[in-house]
């Protein structure tokens, strides 16, 4: 994908993209070789070209064919240092973690072992804990998390995200979301309740979600081709038309809407043909994520051509064409596998990247 730092600079100049974004796309797509004995790690990266702008990544390791190499101190491309590594740790299933300077809280508050899984999901590769917080524990857990983070309560938290994909039915998801909202209120948080899922789909369910207060639904679309082979059943059974309808119904109820999509699973033409129908029902920038193949088995699901950097830059430019006029813009702190970190359609992207 990238052969050297010189190749990186050549590609960036040819496509008129900043080289840092090109590097990050390739890094997420290729993973890295590493002496660290874990399949997946999270860490802060300071690129040598932008040392004062740290960013956060979660990356597949153990890719012997990657041009990137990572250890506890450095990131190298074809043997040449391109960045420094800080705070590396195993990407296990922590119960909760902060983004955006402790204004955004992500919860893994439901047991992940209930999830049958999608082929691109790294959870089955991890010796991770399997957290599940009982309803009576949620308020106490949030209070403890605040105290351990030097906060008296959660009044300053703008969003609490429930990101586990392990709810078998809509009613079970809504029951848990109501418990999370109650626990938020007990700790002074009146912010947005954000849910990533494919099970919240009915009009009755969306009505119930809207009644929970400020609500944000991220529908886990993921891909459009080969859905039965790639996705778990609850996701695969939703057609693209059905997903657009769900987001439209949610938008009508005042719910913030977007979706997740894995870049690298669909051919570009088919992806764009479907995605253009999502634009009118999307109210915040979607989570476009570069496909991370953690092993050779996962490689077989890449769409032909996506093993090249040129394919990814073509896709990025096509996606920019869909969303440039909407005013919606990506933020790296929301999505550490984004095709955009520092620029979008020639515009500088500002704000936190951790």
Regions found by a protein language model. Give the residues of each.
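Canonical Radical SAM [4Fe-4S] cluster-binding loop centered on the CxxxCxxC motif
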Residues: 99-137
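Flexible glycine/acidic-rich beta-alpha junction loops that bind and position SAM and/or redox cofactors
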Residues: 226-234, 263-269, 285-311, 331-349
């Amino acid at each position: 994908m990238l052969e050297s730092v010189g190749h990186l600079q050549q590609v960036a100049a040819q496509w008129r993209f900043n080289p840092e974004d090109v590097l990050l796309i390739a890094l997420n797509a290729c993973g890295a070789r590493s002496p660290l004995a874990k399949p997946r790690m999270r860490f802060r990266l300071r690129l040598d070209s932008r040392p004062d702008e740290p960013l956060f990544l979660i990356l597949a390791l153990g890719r012997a064919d990657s041009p990137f190499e990572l250890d506890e101190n450095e990131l190298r491309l074809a043997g040449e240092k391109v960045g420094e590594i800080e705070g590396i740790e195993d990407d296990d299933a922590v119960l909760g973690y902060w983004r955006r300077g402790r204004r955004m809280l992500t919860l893994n508050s439901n047991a992940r072992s209930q999830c049958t899984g999608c082929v691109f999901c790294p959870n089955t590769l991890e010796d991770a804990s399997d957290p599940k917080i009982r309803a009576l524990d949620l308020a106490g857990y949030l209070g403890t998390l605040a105290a351990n983070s030097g906060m008296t309560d959660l009044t300053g938290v703008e969003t609490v995200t429930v990101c586990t994909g392990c709810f078998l039915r809509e009613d079970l998801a809504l029951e848990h979301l109501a418990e999370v909202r109650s626990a938020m209120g007990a700790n002074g948080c009146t912010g947005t309740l954000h849910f990533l899922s494919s099970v919240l789909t009915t009009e009755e369910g969306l009505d119930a979600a809207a009644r929970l207060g400020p609500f944000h639904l991220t529908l886990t679309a993921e891909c459009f081709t080969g859905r039965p082979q790639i996705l778990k059943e609850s996701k695969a059974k939703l057609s693209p038309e059905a997903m657009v309808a769900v987001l439209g119904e949610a938008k009508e109820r005042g719910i913030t809407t977007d979706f997740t999509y894995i870049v690298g699973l669909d051919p570009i033409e088919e992806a764009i043909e479907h995605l253009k129908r999502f634009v009118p029902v999307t109210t915040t920038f979607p989570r476009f994520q570069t496909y991370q193949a953690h092993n050779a088995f996962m490689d077989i699901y890449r769409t032909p051509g996506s093993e090249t950097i040129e394919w990814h830059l073509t896709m990025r430019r096509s996606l920019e064409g869909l969303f440039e006029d909407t005013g919606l813009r990506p933020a790296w702190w929301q999505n550490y596998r984004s095709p955009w970190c520092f620029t979008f359609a020639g515009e500088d992207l500002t704000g936190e990247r951790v």
